[in-house]
C-alpha cells in the first residue's frame, strides 16, 4: 500500500542535496521509498544545490536555519527550532510514517509520530554525543542526552547502520528489542513492517 512518509533531517551539518556521505545516504533512503511506490515529504534544515536526479517529485520543506558561530548559541537555536519543526510537520500532514535521521538536538519526528499514533522510524548513524565530545565541542550535554533518550524511547523502531552503533544503542534504557541493524540505507516500507504496524 502506498504510504506518505515524512523524512526529517534536522541536522544543520547535512546538506541533503549535497555530495558528502551523509547527504548521499539521505538521498538513497528517499529513493528507496520512492522506488517502493511511496510519497515522501522531505523536511531538512539544509538542502543546498540542485535537486538530485530521481528526487524531482519529492516535496521539500525547509526547517528553521541554525546560525553559524558559537556552539552554545547554535545548540540553543536548534533546541528552540523544535516547536517550529512540529508546526511544519502539522502543516503537511497526514502521514503514514515518520522517518527521522537522528541528530544531536532533535527528537521532533519521533515525538510527533508517537503523538499522532503512527510508526516512527529512527535511523542512527553514529553515537553523536560521544563523537561530538571527542572530535568537536560538546555543549549542553544534559540537553543532548535528554533529546537522545526521548528520541530512542519514542521510536517504534531504531535502525542502526552497524553492529557497533547497535551496541551503543543497547546502552540506553528502553531500546531492547527495537534496534535493527540495516547497513547503508533502507527501504522504509520494510522498516515499517519491522515496527509491527
Where are these regions (language model features)?
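N-terminal subdomain of nucleotide-sugar transferases
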Residues: 1-54, 157, 179
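Short His-centered aromatic/hydrophobic patch
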Residues: 100-105, 124
Amino acid at each position: 500500500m502506498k504510504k506518505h512518509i515524512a523524512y526529517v533531517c534536522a541536522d544543520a551539518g547535512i546538506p541533503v542535496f549535497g555530495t558528502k556521505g551523509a547527504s548521499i545516504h539521505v538521498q538513497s533512503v528517499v529513493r528507496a521509498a520512492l522506488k517502493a511506490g511511496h510519497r515522501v515529504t522531505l523536511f531538512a534544515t539544509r538542502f543546498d544545490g540542485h535537486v538530485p536526479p530521481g528526487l524531482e517529485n519529492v516535496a521539500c520543506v525547509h526547517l528553521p536555519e541554525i546560525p553559524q558561530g558559537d556552539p552554545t548559541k547554535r545548540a540553543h537555536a536548534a533546541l528552540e527550532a523544535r516547536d517550529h519543526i512540529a508546526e511544519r510537520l502539522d502543516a503537511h500532514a497526514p502521514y503514514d510514517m515518520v522517518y527521522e535521521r537522528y541528530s544531536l538536538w532533535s527528537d521532533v519526528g519521533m515525538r510527533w509520530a508517537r503523538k499522532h499514533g503512527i510508526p516512527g522510524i529512527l535511523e542512527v548513524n553514529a553515537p553523536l554525543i560521544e563523537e561530538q565530545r571527542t572530535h568537536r565541542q560538546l555543549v549542553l550535554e544534559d540537553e543532548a542526552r535528554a533529546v537522545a533518550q526521548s528520541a530512542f524511547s519514542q521510536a517504534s523502531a531504531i535502525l542502526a547502520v552497524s553492529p557497533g552503533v547497535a551496541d551503543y544503542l543497547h546502552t540506553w534504557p528502553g531500546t531492547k528489542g527495537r534496534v535493527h541493524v540495516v547497513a547503508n540505507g533502507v527501504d522504509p516500507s520494510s522498516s515499517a513492517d519491522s515496527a509491527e504496524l
